[in-house]
From Swiss-Prot:
CDD domains: F-box_AtFBL13-like. LRR repeats lie at residues 101-130, 136-161, 177-202, 224-249. This is F-box/LRR-repeat protein 25. It comes from Arabidopsis thaliana. The lineage of its organism: Eukaryota, Viridiplantae, Streptophyta, Embryophyta, Tracheophyta. The keyword Lipid biosynthesis does not apply. Residues 27-76 form the F-box domain.
Length: 258
């Protein structure tokens, strides 16, 4: 009789026996996914400090963020102290992408330690954006040596390598408002043997680009414009291997030798 009453109750009140477990299973369906898929989901969240907030969702989520291969920090929104604490809690051995936006002159020591952390974790894609203008930073020597970097994007940086550059896996280099001499740029190119794509935006200090030894470099994008309405010097470019060329808003004469 007890079983019949129980069965009757189950049929007469399905919400008590069926709906609630279904809701529970639905809420756990994402949490039950493998870490790799959860990391992919977290990669769509733009900033790491927001990713960390998912750790309060449940015990399952508590440490998921600490192995996400994508790290992104905006130091205008997050303090360097908090970033250091975040990196100290990071447990993955490999970083796919690392983005940092900050004022270099104010936090140079923190910037160097963050870059070193990313490179020690064999980062593939490195993006650094500095708010100081004109560029005033000086990267340490270890910055110019990496066998893992595949893409480097720098904004408002000063590139003056005093050591041999060795970016042996780099395929894509993007520089915006960066300060570097023709000699420094040639030194960087010599350390990128498989470079395929190069973007130079508002790097007005460059006057001569010799890309003849970059045999795999087939894509070139250049954008030049004077910010202070001062006349710019012409640029001479030697690029015999380029298949795709894009010039944008160029106010200065460019001479191509192919």
């Amino acid at each position: 009789m007890e079983e019949e009453d129980h069965a009757t109750f189950a049929v007469g009140n399905p919400s008590h026996r069926f709906d609630r477990p279904l809701i529970r299973r639905s809420s756990d369906s994402i949490s039950n996914l493998p870490d790799e898929i959860l990391h992919h989901i977290l990669s769509f969240i733009p900033e790491t400090n927001l990713v960390i907030r998912t750790s309060v969702l449940s015990k399952r989520w508590r440490h998921v963020w600490s192995k996400t291969p994508h790290l992104s920090f905006e130091w205008l929104m997050v303090s360097p102290k908090l970033i250091n604490k975040t990196l100290a809690s990071y447990t993955a051995s490999k970083i796919t992408s690392f983005h940092l936006c900050t004022s270099y002159s104010y936090e140079a020591g923190h910037v160097h330690s963050s870059i070193e952390f990313a490179m020690s974790h064999n980062v593939d894609n490195l993006s650094l954006a500095f708010s100081s203008f004109p560029p005033c930073n000086k990267f340490p020597d270890f910055f110019y040596t990496s066998s893992s970097l595949k893409r480097v994007e720098l904004r408002s940086a000063s590139l003056t390598p005093s050591c041999i550059v060795s970016w042996t896996s780099l395929r894509d280099l993007s520089l915006t408002r960066c300060n570097l001499s023709d000699k420094s740029f040639l030194k960087i190119l010599s350390g990128c043997p498989i470079l395929e794509s190069l973007s130079l935006k508002f790097c007005e200090s460059l006057k001569y680009l010799d890309l003849s030894k970059s045999l795999r470099l087939t894509r070139l994008e250049i954008e030049r414009r004077s910010c202070f309405r001062e006349p710019m010097q012409s640029m001479q470019i030697v690029a015999p291997h380029i298949h795709y060329l894009r010039l944008r808003d160029s106010e200065a004469h460019c001479t191509f030798l192919v």
